[in-house]
């Protein structure tokens, strides 16, 4: 028979053991509630589990197109130290207020998201790369939940942001003289596809089985990548959902160049040599608001800043 003091000591020991067990259980749960850290060429990235899908969000696939990189082809992303937090989406690209998207003036927006089904085996899964729509003026990858698709298709799904509006499609004479593409948003998409080709295997995807798909402007983008020599070898299958190349004939190269020069003048940058440097110094919000639709619409959709045949990205 134990004494009251002994019984009290035993109760304390029991509570201690139960507490330790709870801590161990919580630690084990924490370990399985997050997907493994992935080591990319840029650095390590963590993610989160969403309904049984591994999600790695807000991964930069190109350098921020700001300052001197505004209206330049996408450049490689910088490396980072430590582990990057991949639990939240990156910023949406600069765009005016629309029925679907809030206004944004953020140019540091070249991010992608990777979704992979939990419980993958050793075999690599096919890859699907999603290009959002929005008339090349609005939208973002964050508007689409790819968790269910990754599970049902048993595929690694990637969704991407790309430059929009006058940040993604314009024809400035000084850029034309430098043989810079007028289709920077399309080049962003190509940069994302190159990232997929070199990095997606680390997330369990098969870089030799990439399907490019999109809707509306995203579908038109898919069509253009099917004919662009710069996109050759970056994907292997394509799905187009409501949107085709012929939608882009609304803005001929000459008209695009004229409206780009006009945009510069609206920003206080005189036509001629030096206009490009002046335009690069203007705040993103000013560029965006001076380039919003002004009666230049087809069936209610602005077609002012869409891809054009520049002989570089679009033949």
Residue spans for each PLM region:
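N-terminal secretory signal peptides that target proteins for export/translocation
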Residues: 1-9
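Bacterial N-terminal signal peptides
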Residues: 13-23
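Non-catalytic accessory segments of hydrolases
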Residues: 28-186, 207, 301
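Substrate-access "cap/lid" subdomains that shape
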Residues: 98, 198, 232, 241-315
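Alpha/beta-hydrolase active-site loop
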Residues: 109, 179-201, 258
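Alpha/beta-hydrolase-fold catalytic nucleophile elbow
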Residues: 161, 213, 228, 239-242
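Alpha/beta-hydrolase fold nucleophile elbow
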Residues: 204-215
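Short glycine-enriched nucleophile-adjacent loop
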Residues: 219-230
């Amino acid at each position: 028979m134990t004494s009251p003091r002994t019984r009290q000591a035993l109760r304390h020991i029991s509570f201690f053991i139960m507490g330790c067990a709870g801590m161990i259980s919580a630690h084990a749960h924490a370990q399985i509630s997050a997907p493994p850290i992935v080591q990319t060429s840029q650095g390590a990235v963590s993610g989160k589990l969403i309904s049984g899908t591994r999600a790695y969000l807000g991964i930069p696939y190109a350098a921020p197109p700001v300052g001197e990189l505004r209206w330049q082809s996408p450049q490689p992303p910088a490396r980072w130290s430590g582990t990057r937090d991949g639990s939240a989406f990156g910023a949406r690209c600069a765009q005016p207020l629309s029925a679907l998207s809030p206004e944004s003036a953020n140019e540091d927006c070249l991010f992608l998201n990777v979704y992979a089904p939990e419980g993958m085996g050793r075999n690599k899964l096919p890859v699907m790369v999603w290009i959002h729509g929005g008339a090349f003026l609005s939208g973002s990858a964050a508007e689409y939940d790819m968790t269910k698709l990754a599970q049902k298709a048993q595929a690694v799904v990637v969704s991407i942001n790309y430059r929009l509006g006058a940040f993604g499609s314009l024809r400035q004479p000084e850029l034309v003289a430098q043989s810079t593409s007028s289709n920077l948003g399309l080049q962003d998409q190509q940069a994302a596809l190159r990232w997929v080709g070199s990095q997606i295997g680390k997330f369990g995807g098969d870089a030799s089985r990439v399907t490019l798909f999109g809707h509306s402007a995203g579908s038109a983008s898919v069509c253009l990548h099917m004919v662009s020599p710069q996109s050759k070898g970056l994907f292997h299958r394509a799905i187009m959902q409501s949107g085709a190349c012929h939608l882009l004939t609304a803005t001929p190269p000459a008209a695009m160049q004229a409206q780009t020069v006009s945009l510069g003048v609206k920003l206080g940058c005189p036509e001629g040599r030096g206009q490009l440097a002046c335009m690069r110094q203007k705040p993103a919000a000013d560029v965006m608001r001076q380039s919003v639709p002004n009666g230049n619409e087809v069936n209610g959709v602005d077609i002012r800043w869409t891809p054009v045949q520049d002989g570089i990205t679009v033949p």
